[in-house]
Amino acid sequence: GVSVKAWTAVFMLSGSYNTAASSYMQTIFRVQTPAAINGKVKEQCYVFDFAPDRTLKVIAETAKISSKTGKTSGNDRKIMGEFLNFCPIISIEGSKMNQFDVPRMLEQLKKVYVERVVRNGFEDRSLYNDELMKLNDLELQEFDDLKKIIGQTKAMPKTNQVDINNQGLTDEQYEELESLEKKSKKKGKDKQPLTEEEKQRLEELKKKKNNREAAISILRGISIRMPLLIYGAELKDESQEITIDNFASLIDPQSWEEFMPKGVTKQKFNNIKKYYDPEIFCAAGKRIRAMARAADKLSVEERIERITDIFSTFRNPDKETVLTPWRVVNMHLGDCLGGYNFFEQGYETTLSEPRFIDKGEVTANVFAEDSRILEINSKSGLYPLYMAYSIYRTRVKNSLFSVSSIEDEQQIWDKVVAENIFVICKTPMAKSITKRTLIGFRKAKVNTRYFEDLINQIKNKPEHFIKQVDKFVSERTGIKNMKFNAIVGNPPYQVMDGGAQASSVPVYQYFVSIAKKVQPNFISMIMPARWYAGGRGLDDFRADMLSDKTIRSLHDYPKASDLFSNVGSKVDYAIS
């Protein structure tokens, strides 16, 4: 209880993350005593702490706001803002000093939840706030309508039913629920048994709480699509943050329609964004981009490992939009074309040093120093990443100078991406995602182009499409009628045809056919094995494949789950 007037600062060396706010603040009060020192009035005092998480937690507790996910209300933010005016928090990192504002402070407090949200590909309850426990009639109906839309995309497991007759909690009821739950969990001498009336009331309130779980199971179909879009988003100013409020505005209309469930418009999204925890969303997005940006400073092999780790957290939006896993890319291209492979022979674990697979003439031709590779319909950039690395190794081997630094590696890598790799995308966002995968946030030339209405052009205007591809390549290289060494990829399998029960028609055959018409040295693609039986517009394609004497290898997987989870049909890939 002693205060020393001459003191203007306290250096916190004792305690832990669990230090009580009262003890911490009592220590601070030692230096708050007004004083006149050498004729000058003490106007400011300081606390120095090398445990920033402890500081933030204590300040949040002192201001009486919750740092738990989904618990922070608008009023809490106002209270915290007023407290920070009285007691500013300044972070020192290296030579930089930054003052905390409310959003940044809450992001830091919730970082344990942020890591979990990122690791789970936004498939996590921590992403949402407790507004979902206060749904009224209109909002419940909105969720019921949303369920019908997202259910059509098959983007999630069987959705819980929203009981539109069971309204959510009012603010008062929500506080009552928290109070009763807290009382029921008390132990030891503080334990106070609930009365029968309180038990009954607790059960009633819990039933209303169930609607939150049902709503989350619906929002999941939207949420799992967000990380990939955040990863690829192109910002004019990289200091700009991606927030739940500006997220939709950063995605172009064509990409939004492609990546979001059919029927979930930007307007519908803006109606439901209030159910997301803004600090968790913003910090999770920041974390994804920070991981991708940090990879730019690594060696080529380390960067590939980091980028593919990020992709391993992304979820497949639905059965029609399958993101080819890095493992499958390695299986496919390793089995068919060879090159440098990042998995051991069983394709169960990654290797610290990529192994070389030699397929003789095929490998020598496809991964030559002057090779030209094309992917049609890139979604992630992982196919060109594999191809670029194998050509990169060829160039390093033939390099006239010693490759001894990350800068040397990047110089050769950028040359490979600029001269050897060409990519066609379906949307501007797919183009941005591919670019991010290949060169990160650095400035370097990438040969990518997106085609509006790509499937229609390939299906109905194949000759025009080929001319457009040739024009794109000649503009980038100055070479007309370029001969590609290989065309690779995993094309879209089907599109919805508007029929009953999510009826669809196959489209992968058009991508295989267009690749043949381009006449590269080699083609290697993944496709469903439904063409074996014909029908559904596949009869001509089946006849063409059966009579094609250039097919060298066909790998058949009766269990598609050996390659992709949540895909029911047989899959095969071929090289011709």
Regions found by a protein language model. Name each.
Residues 2-73:
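Conserved RecA-like P-loop NTPase helicase motor core
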Residues 1, 10, 373, 487, ...:
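Receiver (REC) domain switch-region micro-motif
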Residues 53-287:
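Long, largely alpha-helical accessory region at the distal end of helicase-like NTP-driven motors
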Residues 328, 381-385, 426, 431-432, ...:
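Signature of N6-adenine DNA methyltransferases within the class I
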